[in-house]
Structure formats: C-alpha cells, structure tokens
C-alpha cells in the first residue's frame, strides 16, 4: 500500500517568490508543490500539500491526519516559535513528523532560534532552501517504510 504524507505550510509561505527573495528565493509555493508532487511519484508516496495563515486551521489539519496519513512534514513558519497549540496537536496524533524551514533558523534573529514544535519532530531540516522539501520527503519515506 502506498504511504501517504501530509505537507503543511504555515503563515506567509503563500508569498514565497514575492517576499524577501534574498532569504527565501524566487521559487513560489506552487512551484514547491509541483516539485514535491513530482518527487513523490519517483519515490512512490502520495502527498497532500496544504498552506494556511490561520493557526486553528493548521491544528485541525494535524488532528484530521491521524488514520489518514503515515507522516507529516511541517513548515510552521512563524508559528514555529509561538504555537503551543500546533505542538500539542502533533504530540497528540503521534505520527512521524519532520520540521522543515527554508532558511537556517539558527543563524537568524534570536527569537527564531527557539522552535516549540521541534519537541514533536523526528528531525529538523533547515537552511537548504526549497530543496529541503525534497530532503524531507526522502527522509520521511525512510521513516515510514
């Protein structure tokens, strides 16, 4: 049976390709989605790709993933540093989780160096640009196989 991975993107990631190109690059979120879909076919997994600017919607996505997905890849963006609700949802569903960030959160502003959600993650991929999504897919495939 084909494994299913949920990819969740948090606030402002819908603006990829438009905002702070020096940090986030020129690739749009739609291009990231297409790249993930292509790579998912190559490694024989199914993905569902979501983006929301609303914390509660992200929590609901996570809660609904139990029984429907084998793992979660999450770029919680700004909620990484603030959302106990997202952390609690990830801990509650007990699915393998990979936290991802386009930039290296550890060489940015001090407040970005603290990830609340990492406590629920099997691993963290950060600082590799949008290529990190492909790295996360490969890593998740290994975890859930």
Question: Where would I find each of the regions flagged by the language model?
Answer:
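Extreme N-terminal starter segment of soluble prokaryotic enzymes
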Residues: 1-5
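Short glycine-rich anion-binding loops that position phosphate/pyrophosphate groups of nucleotides
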Residues: 11-13, 77-80, 103-105
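Glycine- and acidic-residue-enriched helix-capping/strand-helix junction motifs
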Residues: 16-30
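Short beta->alpha junction loops
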Residues: 46-56
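Short, glycine-/small-residue-rich phosphate/pyrophosphate-handling segment
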Residues: 49, 107-145
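Short Gly/Thr/Asp-enriched flexible loops that form oxyanion-binding sites at enzyme active sites
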Residues: 64, 83-93
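Short acidic/histidine-rich motifs immediately flanking catalytic phosphotransfer sites
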Residues: 65-72
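Short, acidic/small-residue loops that bind anionic groups at enzyme active sites
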Residues: 91-107
């Amino acid at each position: 049976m084909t494994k299913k991975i949920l990819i969740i993107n948090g606030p402002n990631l819908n603006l990829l390709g438009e905002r702070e190109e020096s940090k986030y690059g020129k690739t749009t979120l739609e291009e990231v989605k297409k790249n993930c879909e292509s790579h998912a076919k190559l490694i024989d997994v199914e993905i569902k790709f979501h983006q929301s600017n609303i914390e509660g919607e992200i929590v609901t996505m996570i809660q609904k993933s139990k029984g429907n997905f084998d793992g979660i890849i999450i770029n919680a963006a700004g909620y990484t540093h603030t959302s106990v609700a997202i952390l609690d949802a990830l801990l509650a569903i007990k699915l393998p989780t990979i936290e991802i960030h386009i930039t290296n959160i550890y060489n940015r502003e001090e407040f970005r160096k603290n990830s609340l959600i990492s406590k629920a993650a099997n691993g963290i991929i950060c600082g590799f640009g949008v290529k990190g999504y492909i790295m996360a897919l490969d890593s998740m495939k290994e975890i859930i196989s």
